[in-house]
Amino acid sequence: LWLGIMKIGENSGLINALARFLSPVLCRLFPDIPKGHPVLGSIFMNMSANMLGLDNAATPLGLKAMKELQELNPKKDTASNPMIMFLVINTSGLIIIPISIMVYRAQMGAAQPTDVFIPILLSTFISTLVGVIAVSIAQKINLINKPILILMGVICLFFSGLIYLFLNISREEMGTYSTLIANILLFGVIILFILTGVR
């Protein structure tokens, strides 16, 4: 399903447009990837699926991105710098809405399936930040530049706002809002891809 939606996005040019929009950031995190290469779109889609906690969607997208990175790899038996950076970002698991985990907790009879929302938000944000900084130091990538600093500022503001919101509402409302936001984002992405594919 998700690889099919990805194919629609590729054929319509949507993924390339999104990758171009984020290219100032992605090109600095992945300096060895040629500017405008389709793999940047695959990386973006994988990160988006991970942030929504859509494990089943993120896996095929991640495999596709890694396959494309391998095609760019000059040493086929050794992981390239972009592959290492992508793997670290992927496995650190930055999640905005942990849908799958909350569903599993609800299925197992947890009294408050959304209790883990803020701890997951904080831990995955910090793990991703530390991972990116560590790999950037090892690969001598300069993170002190305008696009990266703007992105980090926006992410910090967004996460601060989310945490503030969820600390000031009840657990029941937290579950309702989390599910609603995730479903709207998910549905919106699917509709956007279909509409761009139709045109």
What are these regions (language model features)?
Residues I33-V39, Q70-V88, A111-P119:
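Membrane-interface alpha-helices at helix entry/exit sites of multi-pass transporters
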Residues G9-G13, L22, N73, M108, ...:
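Membrane-interfacial segments
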Residues L1, V103-R199:
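Signature of multi-pass transmembrane helix bundles
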